[in-house]
Amino acid sequence: MSKRGSLQDRASPSEETVKKAQKRRKPIKSCAFCRKRKLRCDQQKPMCSTCKTRGRSGCLYTEKFTHKIETKELFGSTPNIELLKRIEDLEKRLDDKELTEKDVALSTSPFRNPYANFYYLQCKGSGRRIVYGPTSLRTHLSNDDNRFVNTYNQLWSKVKIERNRWKARHKWTMKPETQLLEGPPLEKTGSDILQQVCNVLPSFEQSSKIITDFFNTELETNEVSEVLDKTKIINDFTSSFLPSDELLPNGERRIEKLLPSTKKNYYKIGVILMILCIRHFYKNTPEEIEKFLIMLTGLSTAKVYFIERAQFLLLKYYHRELIWACGDDSHMISLVDLLCSTAIMLGLHLNIREIYKNQENIVGSMESLENLWVWIILSDFNVSLNIGRCLAINSSYFQVDECENGERLPKNTNNYSSTVFFDQSNSCMGKLKRFLRLARPMLDQIYDRSAFPDLAENCKKLRNFVETEFHPISYYTDSELISKVPLCEIKVLAQVLNLLLTFYSLRYLIYKEKSVVLENNILQTILVSFSLVINTTILCFNLDEKHFPEFFDHNCVHLPPFMALSLVYTNFLFPRASTGFCAFLYHKLTLFEKGYYLSSNIKDQEVTDWDLSTLNIPLDKAMNLLTAFKIHSDIFAKWSNDNNKQLRIIMARSYTFVINIALESIYRAVLEKVIKYRTEVENTWLQQLQDELNGSYSLTDNVNTPIDPSLSDLGVTSASPLAGNSPGLPPEEVRNNSENASHNNETGPIETELAQTISNEFWTAYNLGWEELMSQPDYKYLFDTQ
């Protein structure tokens, strides 16, 4: 059989054969797809049955083409090059048409990505506007139950009064840069900015000791030093920070002059100043230094692309995390954008060991550069997740995303630094690299309009990652065992939990998914997160007492190093967990439609048996909401009990800790009011109805039935009606949710009427109680840190 592209002359060499009458060729009626693949075609139009069964978008028949090809031309003695090119061109057009139709079908599909357009525009009265995307906590809160959002906003508006008093008392600001514009000018000394910086620096000997201690790897508070080369930094210090010849009374020398290296590389000075800010000045950076750092950050010519610029920007980002951690990274957006663009221009996304080969004396060790790239990827991931925007360093610069099934890039594909992330070591850095390799594609999918992210599968992968990469969860939720875990492991685990809660929330809010598994997992992950945050704070407090006792002097205003580090690790997790917990319980506790009643008693055994040693919850595990609230209260009691009074005093030095305490107090007040008024109204009406019925209609079973996400109860309460309102939900998923809600979906008329009566009474009592709370003159009890 002759192949396409090598047609042969089939004419017989004999004269008799040529003279024979040739058979008339039948017109081609099969579609192009069937003819090309030699399949049987029933020639139906517009689409044959073969193409239908194969899921094609349409058939193409040859009569659509008017180009006439003579028999002689088709069956010549030599291949027709022009004809072959024409065939190849038509086949390419066919393939392109198929791809275009597939893309159009995908873009108009009711199952397209539902997350990409999920956002919230924050509008301030001052005119400031910020768009928060699908993974932002602000977006989730703004799209939650209106009753809860209104309740939260009312109480928070009152607490803001006390917050502003605290800020005035402690002279706290989140805007140190703009403060320089508003404050009085620096004294005119006739000196340049570098000389002004010299005047506020510690002595040469003290600065040298601070820098040396910064590279002490025995203390985990120095973790960020791994992005720098110690030998290079010390050399930069001695060559750029010149001491005076005169001795101070204590025998030390002041720094007399700052000397930039060749080509005006001021970033070497900037890196060393940031080390001093992190380990010496803390939140009280002198205005002279702040002004110089702002200038370095704002330089925007091509003359600034030194490795030290990327290191400087990363250290500035880290310093902000230590001092001005605000939960959603909104103050990090511009800084991280600069950091990421600088990294790309420096080629850190390429094979670092290849492009910077034999340049160690200028840029530092290869290991420090690779660590710098990992930290930049992490900072980009944090801002993207917490703000809700696309990654600044997209997959084109992060080729790990191109690997399928976790397979390592081939050895000949060695142009990118992606191989850095295939670290199989059991170190904290190895765990962090593997997490970023797993999580970045998940985050990318959220913004890919042509994708349909499988968040349930992503959650499963994240839970498996926790099981395979970390100590058992009990090591993090037990206040004694957590001391056996490296602090940097807590950093990575908190990242996993934060992403896990984000995906759970998206499933709950957008798809209104109310399955037993999801709601159990939400509660369990939140409680594990609470326990992790509280235990980490107390652990770091104890480490500070041991290593930094000078910070416990009552005249000290700075947060001790380990406690500051605990904020870096958990400040983004706490707001998401606490807000999610309160919103979830508020919604469940104010559901009355199906006639379920809140149990007024919590058995001590239920609290004792609650298993916080795993993230995987059995399907048949009934999770009582009141028990969950009791466990939540017990966890946070570690912050407020008398044994930890000193802890609260130290926490009061940090704006972030103070806000966290206030948030927890707000949420607890809201939930306590809901539980109180619902329990009172239920008990009154159920007792009254029981007396009237004289036992003719028994509600005994239902009286003690708590609202909880059990297999029989939770599906009935909310899954069915809400799932029906989700046009973007795939049919199979809708069907599964409906099946969960189908059984036990019957209530008697008396119970239905009673549920409505209890609902009306509850909201009346709740609204009156809420007015009393809002009319109180003093809200210090919600903002108390002592």
Swiss-Prot record:
Chain positions covered by the region annotation Disordered: 1-25, 721-747
Location(s) in or outside the cell: Cytoplasm; Nucleus
Tagged with keyword NADP: no
Main location: cytoplasm
Residues in the DNA-binding region annotation: 31-59
Pfam families: Zn_clus
Residue spans of biased composition, Polar residues class: 737-747
Xref: InterPro entries: Yeast_MDR_Regulatory, Zn2-C6_fun-type_DNA-bd_sf, Zn2Cys6_DnaBD
Recorded superkingdom: Eukaryota
Gene Ontology annotations for the cellular component aspect, listed alphabetically: cytoplasm; nucleus
GO molecular function, one term: DNA-binding transcription factor activity, RNA polymerase II-specific
Transmembrane regions: none
UniProtKB keywords: Activator, Cytoplasm, DNA-binding, Metal-binding, Nucleus, Transcription, Transcription regulation, Zinc
An annotated GO BP: regulation of transcription by RNA polymerase II
PANTHER family (UniProt xref): TRANSCRIPTION FACTOR PDR8-RELATED
Additional detail: Present with 125 molecules/cell in log phase SD medium.
Functional summary from the UniProt entry: Transcription factor involved in the regulation of multidrug resistance genes. Acts in concert with YRR1.
Protein name: Zinc finger transcription factor YRM1
Organism: Saccharomyces cerevisiae (strain ATCC 204508 / S288c) (Baker's yeast)
